[in-house]
């Protein structure tokens, strides 16, 4: 299966003008293992990024973890507010990458492939918590960008992993999501806008088109031990405040690379030299 990672620097530079683009050590090692395990499973993976991202990966010496790197995300996100829609580049990347394809967050690891058939596959469903997924009437939008006939009782789909088998639906989803992001006028919590564009529109549009979908994980069992998939988002949040835990995690990642992907052990040296 053809998959891709994506990386946009727009949100970083919007929040940190004039600063050098950086990536935390846990983020780097998560990215490496996510890519190498996907390839070990017999798949291919491309990094879709912007010009600053491509320069960063080259400086880190990790280009070889992907089959290819392509600069397809505009540095300015093509007019999308990068603070409000920090993951907007991910949807631009998805629009550019041909289906069938798997979009994989850099902190999501697929240890065993699912069965890629004719259904959309997402990471897991999410509950419709009003604080995260408020009523659509709360959004301030320029123009009419939401289609008629959407079922707003549909549970959102987390897209840390997303497989889309059909190019026509992929273009429909990404075009509607991008239109929403470009039309949004800030009027509340950034998070609610971002997750609507990325995670709530997806299943509603699929239902509207009569396209089936499934998930890798049960939303009610997310915090139980998993063997086929690992999502490290929560762990990374904790490590930001605990250096001992961060160091331990990075050493475990180095051990995993040496054991499971020995031909890429040199990547560890590249990363450590770049981080000094």
What are the functions of these language-model segments?
Residues 152-240:
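Catalytic core and acceptor-binding pocket of nucleotide-sugar-dependent glycosyltransferases
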Residues 16, 56-60, 113-115, 201-205:
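A short acidic (Asp/Glu
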Residues 1-77, 233-276:
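N-terminal anchoring/stem segment of glycosyltransferases
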Residues 50-55, 105-112, 219-220:
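Short, polar loop motifs at secondary-structure junctions
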Residues 115-182:
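Conserved catalytic core of nucleotide-sugar-dependent glycosyltransferases
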Residues 26-28, 33-34, 75-104:
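A conserved donor-nucleotide-binding helix/loop in the catalytic core
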């Amino acid at each position: 299966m053809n998959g891709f990672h994506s990386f946009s620097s727009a949100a970083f530079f919007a929040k940190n003008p004039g600063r050098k683009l950086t990536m935390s050590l846990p983020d780097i090692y998560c990215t490496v293992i996510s890519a190498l395990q996907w390839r070990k499973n017999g798949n291919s993976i491309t990094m879709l990024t912007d010009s600053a991202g491509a320069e960063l990966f080259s400086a880190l010496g990790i280009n070889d973890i992907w089959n290819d790197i392509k600069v397809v995300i505009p540095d300015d996100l093509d007019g999308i507010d990068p603070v409000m829609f920090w993951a907007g580049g991910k949807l631009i990347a998805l629009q550019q990458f041909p289906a069938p394809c798997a979009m994989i967050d850099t902190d999501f690891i697929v240890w065993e492939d699912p069965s890629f058939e004719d259904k959309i596959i997402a990471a897991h469903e999410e509950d419709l918590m009003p604080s995260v997924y408020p009523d659509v009437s709360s959004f301030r939008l320029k123009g009419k960008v939401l289609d008629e006939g959407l079922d707003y009782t549909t549970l959102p789909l987390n897209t840390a992993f997303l497989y889309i088998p059909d190019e026509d639906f992929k273009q429909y989803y990404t075009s509607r999501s991008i239109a929403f992001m470009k039309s949004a006028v800030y009027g509340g919590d950034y998070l609610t806008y971002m997750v609507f564009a990325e995670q709530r529109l997806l299943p509603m549009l699929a239902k509207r088109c009569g396209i089936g979908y499934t998930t890798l994980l049960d939303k009610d069992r997310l915090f139980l031990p998993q063997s086929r998939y690992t999502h490290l988002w929560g762990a990374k949040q904790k490590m930001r405040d605990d250096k001992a835990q961060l160091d331990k995690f990075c050493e475990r990642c180095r051990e995993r690379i040496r054991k499971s992907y020995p031909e890429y052990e040199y990547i560890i040296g590249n990363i450590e030299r770049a981080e000094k």
